[in-house]
Amino acid sequence: MALSWVLTVLSLLPLLEAQIPLCANLVPVPITNATLDRITGKWFYIASAFRNEEYNKSVQEIQATFFYFTPNKTEDTIFLREYQTRQNQCFYNSSYLNVQRENGTVSRYEGGREHVAHLLFLRDTKTLMFGSYLDDEKNWGLSFYADKPETTKEQLGEFYEALDCLCIPRSDVMYTDWKKDKCEPLEKQHEKERKQEEGES
């Protein structure tokens, strides 16, 4: 299975690289300790576009999302603390992502199956993307994240260029709206509780 995945990705490389030079951002690279350091901390979900209908439906309800990545380099896992606003309510969830270093992917079990995403970087180090089904033209898609809730025109431009590489219309992009976030109070409460626990220990 892993071998067939690698062969499929390798077969895509000439296609991706033959297009706009920025398509190189869609070529998965191995995840290193430096990579894990780079993604550590707080990230905001900005936008996404998927051809996969299941993923499209799941993101339509999202009004705002931010999360924290805390990697464990020894166990190749990432502790995820996620704050998501849907239907004007805050939903908090914590879980672990598995890191597949050689494939450049992270995965999470949800709904009884494993969801895999490629970790992709843009030129701006304050942004990142996750690519889904990059070996399946009928289902592939991208989600875009930044270290702040609002992005610059240049940052969004890089995301759009990546979508162009996959021939996904920009009209298909779904955006979040930080003004609709309902989770900031809960985040502050959690932060206060953590500081109290640290003080007691």
UniProtKB/Swiss-Prot annotation:
Q: Which residues cross the membrane?
A: none
Write down which residues bear the modification named Pyrrolidone carboxylic acid.
19
InterPro entries found in the cross-reference section:
A1A_glycop, Calycin, Lipocln_cytosolic_FA-bd_dom
Entry PTM: N-glycosylated. N-glycan heterogeneity at Asn-33: Hex5HexNAc4 (minor), Hex6HexNAc5 (major) and dHex1Hex6HexNAc5 (minor).
**Could you say which residues form the signal peptide?**
1-18
Identify the Pfam families for this entry: Lipocalin
GO BP, sorted A to Z: acute-phase response; positive regulation of interleukin-1 beta production; positive regulation of interleukin-1 production; positive regulation of tumor necrosis factor production; regulation of immune system process
Q: List the disulfide bonds.
A: 23-165, 90-183
Q: State the UniProt keywords alphabetically.
A: Acute phase, Disulfide bond, Glycoprotein, Pyrrolidone carboxylic acid, Secreted, Signal, Transport
Compartment list: Secreted
GO CC aspect terms: azurophil granule lumen; blood microparticle; collagen-containing extracellular matrix; extracellular exosome; extracellular region; extracellular space; platelet alpha granule lumen; specific granule lumen
Which conditions up-regulate this protein?
Synthesis is controlled by glucocorticoids, interleukin-1 and interleukin-6, It increases 5- to 50-fold upon inflammation.
The record's family statement is: Belongs to the calycin superfamily. Lipocalin family.
User: What is its biological role?
Assistant: Functions as a transport protein in the blood stream. Binds various hydrophobic ligands in the interior of its beta-barrel domain. Also binds synthetic drugs and influences their distribution and availability. Appears to function in modulating the activity of the immune system during the acute-phase reaction.
Q: What is this protein called?
A: Alpha-1-acid glycoprotein 2
Q: Which organism is it from?
A: Homo sapiens
- Organism classification, top ranks? Eukaryota, Metazoa, Chordata, Craniata, Vertebrata
